[in-house]
Amino acid sequence: MSEKPKVYQGVRVKMTVKELLQQRRAHQATSGANLSGSSGLHLPDTTMPSSAGLYFEPEPTSSTPSYFQTREFSTCVSCEEIPSCLDQIFESYLQTDTLPEPLLNSAQIAPHYFPESCQVAPFCHNQSLIPGSPSDSSSLSGSFDCSYSPTQLPSYTPENYSSPPSLDSLHSSLPEEGYFCQHWPSHPQYNHSSPATPSSVCYYASCEAEHLDALRTTEFFSYSGMDCADFAPPVATTGDFYKRETSCDACYS
């Protein structure tokens, strides 16, 4: 007997819930139609005061000129757009009131400086030129080019480079770092400033690649701090040098 009322009550509750839902849906449909009709009539009355407040509130507080109107506030409704509108207002106000004075001052001061700069520049250029010469671009470029002219370069070439067949001229073009190595063996009378013989030139030019390692290890590093004029080579190095000199003579023959 106890199970039947529970099933009956449960079924009865489900039926009542369905009925309540149907009633609520019907009531919402009817009330929604009534609210839509009433809201269409009453909405303009509720929105007009707020829009009127937006249009008419800034008028008594604004002390700006006549060109500043309240139409800008009509677009600035959200709180995020209000600072940008205020910045635009301040910029427009500062540009119209404060900027004309510096502009007038700069317009008056500028003519005093620009003519002076325009007059001083030709005067400086004319000082470097010959008096009476025209001051066009060709003469100015010629005056600046006179400081460094490429035609002066061949005057130094005969001093450093002579005729190629002569061996002394070839030796004069060689660097001095490898020059003193030629005077070490068997010719102590040649100092650092004396010219070299053709055999020594052959030794530097053709035979240097063959005996470069031997010269660096035995002669150059051991006697690098001594003078070439005061150097007395040992007997073994003189014999090696005569052998090398004869081989170099064979190269020329």
UniProtKB/Swiss-Prot annotation:
Its main location: cytoplasm. PROSITE patterns: OCA. Keywords: Activator, Cytoplasm, Nucleus, Transcription, Transcription regulation. GO terms for cellular component: cytosol; nucleoplasm; nucleus. It is found in: Cytoplasm; Nucleus. GO terms for molecular function: DNA binding; POU domain binding; transcription coactivator activity. Expressed in tuft cells. Residues 5-27 form the OCA domain. The keyword NADP does not apply. PANTHER family: COLORECTAL CANCER-ASSOCIATED PROTEIN 2, POU CLASS 2 HOMEOBOX ASSOCIATING FACTOR 3. Belongs to the POU2AF family. Interacts with POU2F3 in a DNA-dependent manner; this interaction increases POU2F3 transactivation activity. In the N-terminus possesses a conserved OCA domain for bivalent binding to class II POU domain-containing transcription factors and to an octamer DNA motif (5'-ATGAAAT-3'). Transcriptional coactivator that specifically associates with POU2F3. This complex drives the development of tuft cells, a rare a rare chemosensory cells that coordinate immune and neural functions within mucosal epithelial tissues. This is POU Class 2 homeobox-associating factor 3. It comes from Mus musculus.
